[in-house]
């Protein structure tokens, strides 16, 4: 929402496939193997958590010529894999709405997430994304976005959990430095706890809502 409302000219993100882990490389290969073009941007805020913003464009899809997604992760490479999953699921959901009996009604409700997405998905609306798709801008390498130490296994090895600072502690410190508060609630069910799982819900009141 922050990027869209402020029309932020975000830096572009460059991906070097040779630096990607095996699993992430496969997501990137599949995600770039069609006529769809995914434009990646660095939307990281002062919280320091690597955040990707993507505009996926098509020249042959009249229903979904533009689709937008955003995601974040402590590890920029995991964020990249997530953005491709998010875009794929969004295309399925939006196409279902676009071909539904209430498509025109939903599209007219541009104050809703789905309505706005469908209205701006038509090729004739490509111009509303010019602040992202046009003009020169800085380019950041994927692994350089954010200010957190990415913890991922080295090629052929395993991650050393003791190496480097705890990224979660750094996130909390970044929030405090930005004057933000993290409210965390344990919502683990008895069934989840019995199998060793823990579930929390976190709210940061000072952060911009998703939509």
PLM features: what roles do these ranges have?
Residues 1-211:
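Helix-biased "structured C-terminal domain" signature
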């Amino acid at each position: 929402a922050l990027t869209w409302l402020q029309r932020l000219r975000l830096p572009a993100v460059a991906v070097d496939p040779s630096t990607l882990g095996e699993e992430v490389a496969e997501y990137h290969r599949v995600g770039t193997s069609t006529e769809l073009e995914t434009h990646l941007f660095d939307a990281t805020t002062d919280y320091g958590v690597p955040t990707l913003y993507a505009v996926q464009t098509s020249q042959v899809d009249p229903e979904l010529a533009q689709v937008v997604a955003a995601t974040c992760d402590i590890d920029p490479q995991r964020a990249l894999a997530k953005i491709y999953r998010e875009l794929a699921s969004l295309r399925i959901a939006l196409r279902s709405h676009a071909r539904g009996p209430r498509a025109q009604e939903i599209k007219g409700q541009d104050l809703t997430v789905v309505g706005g997405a469908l209205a701006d998905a038509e090729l004739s609306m490509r111009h509303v994304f010019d602040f992202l798709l046009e003009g020169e801008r800085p380019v950041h390498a994927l692994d350089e976005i954010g200010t957190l130490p990415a913890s991922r296994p080295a090629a052929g090895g395993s991650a050393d959990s003791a190496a480097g600072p705890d990224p979660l502690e750094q996130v909390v410190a970044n929030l405090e430095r930005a004057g933000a508060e993290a409210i965390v609630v344990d919502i683990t069910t008895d069934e989840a706890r019995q199998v060793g799982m823990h579930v929390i819900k976190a709210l940061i009141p000072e952060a911009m809502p998703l939509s």
